Amino acid sequence: MESNSSQCEDETPSLLWGLDPVFLAFAKLYIRDILDLKESGQVQGVFFYNGHPIKQVDILGTVIGVREKDAFYSYGVDDSTGVINCICWKRLNNTKSSSATATPSARELSLTSQLKKLQETIAQRAKLEIGDIIRVRGHIRMFRGEREIHATTYYKVDDPVCNVQIARMLELPAIYRKVYDQPFHSPALKEDEALSNPGTLDLDSLTCLLSEKAKEFLVENRVQSFYQQELETVESLLSLANQPVIHSACSGQMGFKNDTTSRAIHSIFRNAVKLLQEEGLVFQKDGGFDNLFYVTREDKELHRKIHRIIQEECQKPNHVEKGCHFLHILACARLSLSPGLSEPVLQQVLQLLEDQSDIVSTTEKYYTAF
């Protein structure tokens, strides 16, 4: 019981799991790692990889074993890193129809034959043999002490020249490097840790946390514009920026902030505002004051001008059907509004306009206005 309670203390609280995108996705993991996942002590059926909560996975491999039961197939799947058992439920056969008194019409016969062909195709792709390539998406379960996958979706992959397998081999290392191998850090936990245990964050982490808190302050108070010096007078933000940080020799920040000098505080606020700029949440206008920042979501004039640009451009013959591409809107906005308008700021404005139903995304990166 003591080991179980200590394990729960090391885990991220279950209420915060939804903040990690990996929790809601089908994690593309190597089978070796699926077999080595640590099970949660809070919720059964949830596992952890490097702090990421995982409940469903996506695998691709070769069938090396087949067992058929009345209700399901049991496939042993090998992806060259390990072997795991996959329970793939059989699809119900609804082709049997009750005896009908009326003779079916030619159209009904045609639909019935097409449906039968479709069901035969599905059945062929659902029943696999040893040596076939299978893709499985499902939940991780324990059965008689062995870990297995209960499939929600599975199918045979036609891959005669190994294109799909090669693409998977190239995709997984990048996903691991960018997502799975990056520890999950909840902003809420970071804030609690920083406030309760001063000095537990490095400079970069403290800057990111300050940026998040500044964003919350701007949204809650509906701030339209601000100077950096004004943010530095907000007590909650200032107390956070005053936290001591862990020194990092490798990043060249040794001795940066042992004391809470005004210059150090000014620097961390400047970097936090820069992060907000990179996200497109705040921006500066050409020809304006150097230290004056505008909040993107509160600049209604900018929203109206971007909306008008999309309306006018969508009336032109080459944009009537499909709408305007994001880069075309950006070029027009830079030409007529501000040469320094950034892509993140425009993306924020387009998202706000779409949320208000002023514009619609017709296809990826294309927008039309009403």
UniProtKB/Swiss-Prot annotation:
Alphabetized CDD domains for the sequence:
hOBFC1_like (cd04483)
Q: Which UniProt keywords apply?
A: Chromosome, DNA-binding, Nucleus, Telomere
Domain of life per record: Eukaryota
Q: Which GO terms describe its molecular function?
A: single-stranded telomeric DNA binding; telomeric DNA binding
Region described as Winged helix-turn-helix (wHTH) 1: 193-297
- Annotated DNA-binding residue span(s): 57-157
* Residues covered by region (Winged helix-turn-helix (wHTH) 2): 298-370
What is an annotated GO biological process for this record, any one? telomere capping
A single Gene Ontology CC term: chromosome, telomeric region
Q: Where is this protein localized, as stated in its record?
A: Nucleus; Chromosome, Telomere
For region Interaction with CTC1, the annotated ranges are: 1-187
Determine if Nucleus is one of this entry's keywords: yes
Under the heading InterPro entries, the entry gives: CST_STN1_C (IPR015253), CST_Stn1_wHTH1_sf (IPR042082), NA-bd_OB-fold (IPR012340), RFA2-like (IPR040260), Stn1 (IPR014647), Stn1_N (IPR018856), WH-like_DNA-bd_sf (IPR036388), WH_DNA-bd_sf (IPR036390)
Biological role: Component of the CST complex proposed to act as a specialized replication factor promoting DNA replication under conditions of replication stress or natural replication barriers such as the telomere duplex. The CST complex binds single-stranded DNA with high affinity in a sequence-independent manner, while isolated subunits bind DNA with low affinity by themselves. Initially the CST complex has been proposed to protect telomeres from DNA degradation. However, the CST complex has been shown to be involved in several aspects of telomere replication.
| Known partners and oligomeric status | Component of the CST complex, composed of TEN1/C17orf106, CTC1/C17orf68 and STN1; in the complex interacts directly with TEN1 and CTC1. Interacts with ACD/TPP1, POT1 and POLA1.
* Protein family membership: Belongs to the STN1 family.
- Output this protein's name: CST complex subunit STN1
